[in-house]
């Protein structure tokens, strides 16, 4: 289990990843599937890409095989 400080650090790191991903996905216009993230990580990416606008995120699959699909709406 993560401490509060670890969660804050991870959230900041994932916010940067989401910003980068949003830019790249908008640039290339191809949906991207991200695997290997726990529910906390997926939620942070969902929230950050939603805040950027112009992106659609969707979790697919079940359990340890759950993945995040991201596509540009532009």
Residue spans for each PLM region:
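RNA-contacting regions in translation and RNA-metabolism proteins
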Residues: 1-74
